[in-house]
Amino acid sequence: MDNIAILEALLYTSGDEGLEQKQIIDILDINLNQLEDLVSKYHSHGLTIQRYGSTYVLTTKKETSTYIEQLVKEKSKMKLSQAAMETLSIIAYNQPLTRGDIEMIRGINSDGAVKTLIARGLVEAKDVDHSRSHHLITTDLFLNVFGIENLDALPTTEEDEAEMDEFFSNLVNQKGESNE
């Protein structure tokens, strides 16, 4: 069996979490250049291999998005409250942050929202040298959920306002009916 077929099977088995590039390199006994070559050569009818940070995920091609949106429209997998969405936006644009930093920006206790984001795997707490507080950062799952390869792909204030509105509209569309 060739490495492309094995890579496809590995990524399919790993699901939405994907696999870290080091895992793939170790399992297939290849180097980074060979991995990137496999990813660029991968072709399937409706699937592609996408990189989110250092994680590779088997995902659908962009051309299938309208059909998938119809399917997913009724079943939102990741519903978040308005507070959680605000907190996630603050972390995404200003990371790394402590919980205290977030409270200062929002002007309200955000522990519940932070716990929700950590539980959903969108945010993680990292220990920082010379600090007793955990610093919150977004995860590769955050990149995957919002369809961006890295944090540089987040809209900035210099970009077209319509693009910013669309990004935040997508965030708001993910919010649920519950408080956290």
Swiss-Prot record:
Recorded GO CC terms: cytoplasm
GO biological process: cell division; chromosome separation; DNA replication
Short name of one Pfam family: SMC_ScpB
Family annotation (SUPFAM superfamilies): Winged helix' DNA-binding domain
Keywords, in A-Z order: Cell cycle, Cell division, Chromosome partition, Cytoplasm
UniProt xrefs under Gene3D superfamilies: Winged helix-like DNA-binding domain superfamily/Winged helix DNA-binding domain
Intracellular or extracellular location(s): Cytoplasm
Transmembrane segments: none
Superkingdom: Bacteria
Keyword Cytoplasm: yes
Predominant cellular place of this UniProt entry's protein: cytoplasm
Quaternary assembly: Homodimer. Homodimerization may be required to stabilize the binding of ScpA to the Smc head domains. Component of a cohesin-like complex composed of ScpA, ScpB and the Smc homodimer, in which ScpA and ScpB bind to the head domain of Smc. The presence of the three proteins is required for the association of the complex with DNA.
Family: Belongs to the ScpB family.
Function of the protein: Participates in chromosomal partition during cell division. May act via the formation of a condensin-like complex containing Smc and ScpA that pull DNA away from mid-cell into both cell halves.
Name used for this protein in its record: Segregation and condensation protein B
Lineage start: Bacteria, Bacillati, Bacillota, Bacilli, Bacillales
The encoding gene: scpB
